[in-house]
Amino acid sequence: MSDGAGAAARRWGKCGGRSCSRESIMVAFKGVWTQAFWKAVTAEFLAMLIFVLLSVGSTINWGGSENPLPVDMVLISLCFGLSIATMVQCFGHISGGHINPAVTVAMVCTRKISIAKSVFYITAQCLGAIIGAGILYLVTPPNVVGGLGVTTVHGNLTAGHGLLVELIITFQLVFTIFASCDSKRTDVTGSIALAIGFSVAIGHLFAINYTGASMNPARSFGPAVIMGNWENHWIYWVGPIIGAVLAGALYEYVFCPDVELKRRLKEAFSKAAQQTKGSYTEVEDNRSQVETEDLILKPGVVHVIDIDRGEDKKGKDSAGEVLSSV
């Protein structure tokens, strides 16, 4: 066996088997196996559980009427907004206070958290939503449970309309989150949690009659699991996630790009341009067309070949007269 083949075999022995897979997984999930990380995951689970229990509980219709009154819509909107503001204030310093899979996906797309971390976050959020909705179902009398706050598109609207509405209201929510939590800003003096809560409340005031105003895939997922109602459920994942990614990308890369990121991108583009250009720098050459037809470039020296006379006329060194700089 040759030395190259032997080296390849040794590498395969180390990285081709089960041990390499284990090491690769450990590297991919670096930072996950810490106490702080699991505290953050638990915080997302608990925050979502409480949020769904309190906010979805406000949608329970105790009066027996088919449609909620305008005053009830205001109550629902305020309950959702104040609930999320409270949870962000309580758990924001532990987990970042995502409490929304769409927000977590936006954070991944803007390189604020890792993909591995987002997987655990979204799983915890969905489990919290299911348990929160389950507790609400258990403590609510059967005759008033109704749909348990399952989000549905209005009967006069198509799925496309619902998708667009969810995209828009989630866009404004996530843009508010990025703008309020921007560490580069020095003009933010109010409560970040309250700003996020107001954004959620505004989205509900506008969109309750359209789609139920989800803005949060986990919030829709929990009641849907408990009630087994999956009608147009995909809208409440696709719409919010697209809106969140658009908002995060626009804020981070267009409106308020990070200075360090801009510098790195500029350096990368400059380096790529230099590599594409090559080792020679073009300069103006005032010689006649006949004289420059056969120009051979060598590092530091220019040679002109006169075909008629078969002579090799050596040009001046680039240090003496600039013909081409290397």
From Swiss-Prot:
One of its GO terms (biological process) is cerebrospinal fluid circulation. The modification Phosphothreonine is found at residue 292. Phosphorylation by PKC at Ser-183 reduces conductance by 50%. Phosphorylation by PKG at Ser-114 in response to glutamate increases conductance by 40%. Isoform Long: Palmitoylated on its N-terminal region. The chain crosses the membrane at residues 40-60, 73-92, 119-139, 159-179, 188-208, 235-255. One of its GO terms (cellular component) is endosome membrane. A lipid is attached at residues 15, 20 (S-palmitoyl cysteine). The modification Phosphoserine is found at residues 114, 183, 279, 288, 324. Residues 61-72, 140-158, 209-211, 226-234 are extracellular. Its main location: membrane. Disulfide bonds: none annotated. Forms a water-specific channel. Plays an important role in brain water homeostasis and in glymphatic solute transport. Required for a normal rate of water exchange across the blood brain interface. Required for normal levels of cerebrospinal fluid influx into the brain cortex and parenchyma along paravascular spaces that surround penetrating arteries, and for normal drainage of interstitial fluid along paravenous drainage pathways. Thereby, it is required for normal clearance of solutes from the brain interstitial fluid, including soluble beta-amyloid peptides derived from APP. This is Aquaporin-4. The lineage of its organism: Eukaryota, Metazoa, Chordata, Craniata, Vertebrata.
